[in-house]
């Protein structure tokens, strides 16, 4: 603890735990312990994201995956396991706030290899990139407007609270 009362976490520990500068942490106390836990806005809305995944699958017949900055939080594809860690390609899309649309049949890895056409949109709320909306289809239809709408719904829900 520094002279201003702030908790200082050494760079090596931040690097090992994947804590970025300015990232939100939850602080818990337990008798003689202080517990720091990474805070993920998107995870608060797992129920909403799970319902969105099922709804979109039923209406559009596409698979929907919603992630936070580290892992899958909801998926309409039963083969994609929740809490699967994201690989570096997805992390780059989140950090760079980039949208990705595959124009040809391709494969991505979300714990297992998934083949299809992909639309990947970052979830941005309060100027922070919080995760991804991933639409997986078996046709080359343009789902970018649907992906943007879903990312906006999730971001707006986060901004409200």
Predicted regions and their residues:
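A generic structural motif
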Residues: 14, 79-80, 136
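Juxtadomain coupling helices with adjacent low-complexity linkers
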Residues: 46, 50-55, 86, 90-91, ...
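Fold-independent oxyanion-binding glycine-rich loops
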Residues: 104, 123, 138
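Structured interaction and signal-relay segments at domain junctions
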Residues: 53-112
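Intrinsically disordered, low-complexity terminal regulatory regions
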Residues: 1-74
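A short beta-strand signature within small-molecule sensing/ligand-binding domains used
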Residues: 113-124
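Short hydrophobic/glycine-rich mini-motifs in sensory/regulatory modules
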Residues: 123-133
């Amino acid at each position: 603890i520094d002279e201003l009362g702030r908790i200082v976490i050494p760079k090596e520990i931040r690097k090992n735990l994947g804590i970025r500068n300015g990232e939100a942490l939850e602080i818990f106390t337990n008798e003689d312990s202080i517990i720091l836990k990474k805070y993920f806005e998107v995870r608060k809305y797992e129920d909403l994201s799970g319902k969105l995944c099922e709804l979109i699958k039923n209406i559009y017949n596409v698979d929907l995956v919603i992630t936070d900055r580290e892992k899958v939080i909801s998926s309409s594809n039963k083969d994609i396991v929740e809490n699967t860690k994201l690989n570096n390609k997805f992390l780059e899309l989140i950090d760079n706030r980039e949208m990705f649309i595959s124009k040809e049949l391709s494969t991505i890895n979300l714990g297992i290899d998934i083949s299809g056409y992909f639309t990947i949109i970052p979830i941005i709320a309060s100027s922070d990139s919080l995760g991804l909306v991933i639409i997986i289809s078996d046709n080359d239809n343009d789902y970018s407007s649907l992906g943007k709408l879903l990312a906006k719904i999730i971001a707006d829900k986060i901004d409200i609270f």
